[in-house]
Amino acid sequence: MQLTKWGKNKMPNWTFNTLKVVAYSDDEGAIKQFDEFVKLSIVPAKVYDEEGKVKGESKEDKAFTFEGVHPMPKDLMITSGTRTPEEEKQAQENLKKYGHKDWYDWSIAEWGTKWNASNFCILEEILDDKYSKELTVSFDTAWCPPMEWLQKATEKFPLIRFEMEVSEESDAFMGKPIAQYGKVCENITDINYPS
């Protein structure tokens, strides 16, 4: 799915995502990968002060993050658009080192969406029975589902199964991408309404 199809410089329409992660109990390697995925992806939520700056982490609340599977390099945390001479120098160094000048270009190329997951909710706590371990979460993304992130997740954790359900807020597309063994079946349908 190409982000530019919906216009990368406009305010985003939101995509609603539900992700189910499954490891079957008879596969010890899959169970280890599942536990590692959960450890990296479900993290303490950040706590912000009145000015919107991070002041710490919550002891109770959790967040789902793309950073656990595919972290953004800290050097990329500069703005696109107008830059100081120092930021422009950093942008050129970033381009050489990472292939992207800033967080915006990197996150679109590497995660498939402008920002990290937002409005996270655990829909089903880790279900651990004699057949499988499962975790189901919902989250929102800007413009598109995080297909590039999903590809990286299945490459890093090939033995676990990722099942997503996605829909765009104006119903421009929907689908049920599935990933396992390093491959993603997108299964996204564009719905073209007459203008």
Regions found by a protein language model. Name each.
Residues W6, K10-S195:
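Long, contiguous binding/interaction regions
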Residues L3:
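Cationic, low-complexity basic patches in intrinsically disordered or flexible, solvent-exposed regions
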